[in-house]
């Protein structure tokens, strides 16, 4: 079963996932999204970029998902759809697919969402950070029959790391 780390903003989902991946030591493919606070624009807001799981984190218009200003996203859906093609590539044997993070910005990116769900239907282990929001897509992900949700909060995040490491090791 795939692993979903579900929780609110800034609770440690990505940190927990990185600790788990470091402990398991398997090749990682997939993606990570990041709000680049240092590139804040007063008119546009905080830029959000999508990066391959490994490699340099270079910010270009090709991986700029959009901006968040006053918690209101301005989304470039085409970037999600283009990245879906990369995500469709067959993962290396013995690897883990990272999806950090699944949220509301991809709500209208149909190809991207279909690719995520295809991986959840598959056998290559997935570990994903999932925003604690209710959207049709996120509800579909959280209720996927091949997924186990681990709900993270400030009180349980340290002990949850070991539980998730043990769980992921059993997937190989």
Task: Go through each PLM region and give its residues.
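The conserved Walker
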Residues: 9
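N-terminal phosphate/diphosphate-binding loop that engages ATP/GTP or pyrophosphate donors
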Residues: 22-70
């Amino acid at each position: 079963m795939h692993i979903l780390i579900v929780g609110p903003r800034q609770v440690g989902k990505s940190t927990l996932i990185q600790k788990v991946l470091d402990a398991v030591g398997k090749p990682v493919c997939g993606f990570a999204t990041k709000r680049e606070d240092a590139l804040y624009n007063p008119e546009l807001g905080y830029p959000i970029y999508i990066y391959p799981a490994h490699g340099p984190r270079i910010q270009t218009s090709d991986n700029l998902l959009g901006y968040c200003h006053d918690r209101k996203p301005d989304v470039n859906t085409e970037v999600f759809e283009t990245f879906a093609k990369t995500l469709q590539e067959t993962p290396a044997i013995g690897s883990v697919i990272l999806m950090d993070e699944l949220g509301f910005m991809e709500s209208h990116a149909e190809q991207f969402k279909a690719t995520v769900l295809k991986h959840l239907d598959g056998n290559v282990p997935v570990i994903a950070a999932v925003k604690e929001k209710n959207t049709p897509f996120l509800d579909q992900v959280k209720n996927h029959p091949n997924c186990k949700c681990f709900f993270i909060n400030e009180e349980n995040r340290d002990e949850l790391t070991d539980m998730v490491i043990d769980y992921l090791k059993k997937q190989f």
